[in-house]
């Protein structure tokens, strides 16, 4: 579990005595993405075949932001059956990323203000700058499939200070980069229902829509 200092103390008190809970204290910077990358780069996730990435961000700027978060969690791990259904895909060694198919976004409008930054980051991991990502940034992932992201070695200072940004930040770009990294590592992305998901082939320049 990653959390800012004030919340980390409370979480340690709640989880005291549970050896299965590890609290990683991180500043409130880079939203859920920067702490997740820290956990990845630190090696804390290496011992797992699959990791569930969820967060408590409510996206108050979206009319249905909290509802979306609840729907995503329910689909990924809202019941033992849902969890088993998602995890079953990791029995296939080719699968690296699993999430809710209806929230896998490939339409050009979802580039928003992040395209140039995604293109630059994709070039750094030698991946094509295509568009296809799980909106809401909640999914199951095989840590080994994120090896290209570890090579970015992004310091905390590379992430913008928290100012309620709605788009155009490093963490927004990385949200869109994750499936590209999975593909670059040689793995597939699947919807929970089994459909193979691929990023849209878009030109590297020109109109956004």
Summary of predicted features, one role per range:
Residues 1-209:
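ER/Golgi luminal nucleotide-sugar-dependent glycosyltransferases, focusing on the catalytic module
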């Amino acid at each position: 579990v990653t959390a800012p200092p004030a919340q980390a103390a409370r979480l340690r008190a709640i989880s005291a005595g549970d050896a299965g809970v590890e609290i990683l204290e991180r500043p409130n910077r880079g939203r859920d993405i920067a702490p997740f990358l820290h956990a990845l780069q630190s090696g804390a996730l290496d011992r797992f075949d699959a990791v569930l990435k969820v967060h408590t961000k409510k996206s108050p700027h979206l009319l249905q932001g909290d509802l979306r978060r609840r729907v995503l969690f329910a689909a990924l791990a809202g019941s033992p059956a849902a969890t088993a259904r998602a995890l079953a895909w990791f029995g296939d060694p080719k699968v690296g990323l699993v999430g809710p198919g209806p929230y896998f976004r490939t339409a050009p409008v979802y580039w928003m203000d992040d395209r140039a930054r995604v293109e630059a980051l994709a070039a750094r991991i030698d991946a094509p700058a295509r568009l296809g990502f799980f909106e809401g940034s909640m999914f199951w992932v095989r840590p080994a499939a994120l090896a290209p992201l570890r090579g970015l070695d992004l310091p905390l200072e590379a992430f913008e200070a928290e100012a309620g940004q709605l788009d155009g930040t490093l963490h927004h770009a990385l949200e869109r980069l994750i499936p590209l990294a999975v593909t670059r590592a040689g793995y597939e992305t699947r919807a929970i229902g089994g459909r193979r998901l691929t990023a849209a082939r878009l030109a590297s320049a020109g109109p956004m829509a």
